[in-house]
A protein has these predicted regions:
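Conserved ABC transporter NBD signature motif
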Residues: 5-16, 25
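Conserved ABC ATPase "signature" region
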Residues: 62-81
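Conserved ABC ATPase signature
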Residues: 85-89, 93
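ABC ATPase C-loop
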Residues: 102-103
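Catalytic Walker B motif of ABC-type/P-loop ATPase nucleotide-binding domains
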Residues: 110-113
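Short loop immediately C-terminal to the Walker-B catalytic DE motif
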Residues: 116-117
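ABC-family nucleotide-binding domains
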Residues: 120
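H-loop/switch region of ABC-family ATPase nucleotide-binding domains
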Residues: 146-147
């Protein structure tokens, strides 16, 4: 992650970004890649979610982790695919799995690159509703990258447009 302001200071949780150790920053940040298949690390969908839960909640028993993973898969409409390889899912299902896996953690900042691309209206609303809930209940900051201007208008507190070599407030 390399962000250097032309002037001024970038602060994350009140600290100058240049003075934050990378490891500390990465522990507070969750990322969903534009191509979600690039972030999967396990052999099946259930294990993918369990891995994320365990990473952030290592005090839970195996049974608790399994139950929580099954509950979350059900919420996202992915329960019937629990034994599938993540790579066997459709692009939209992979995207939901990636978002689900990231939300399993205790991050304070989420960077989501096109999390609703390829989703139908219902799935888009479900993902965005879940994000809104996490923002309200956990105080998350979300940086959402999208080409969907209507989505950005509907959900964002602040919007910026990247054009040419500049970043402009929308």
């Amino acid at each position: 992650l390399k962000i250097n302001p032309y002037e001024g200071v970038i602060k994350v949780f009140g600290k100058d970004l240049k003075k934050i150790k990378k490891k500390e920053l990465y522990r507070t940040m969750g990322i969903v890649f534009q191509n979600p298949a690039n972030q999967f690390i396990t052999q099946n969908v259930l294990d993918e979610v369990k891995q994320s839960i365990r990473l952030w909640n290592n005090k839970l028993s195996d049974e608790e982790v399994n139950n929580e993973a099954l509950k979350r898969l059900d919420e996202y409409g992915l329960l019937r695919y629990k034994r599938y390889s993540p790579y066997m899912l459709s692009q939209g299902q992979q995207r939901r799995l990636a978002v689900l896996s990231v939300l399993a953690g205790e991050q304070k900042i989420l960077l989501l690159d096109e999390p609703t691309y390829g989703q139908d209206y219902r799935s888009t609303c479900a993902i965005m509703s879940l994000l809104e809930d996490k923002i309200k209940t956990k105080g998350l900051s979300v940086i959402l990258i999208t080409h969907d201007e209507e989505l950005a208008k509907s959900y964002a507190d602040k919007r910026y447009v990247v054009r040419g070599n500049g970043v402009y407030e929308a």
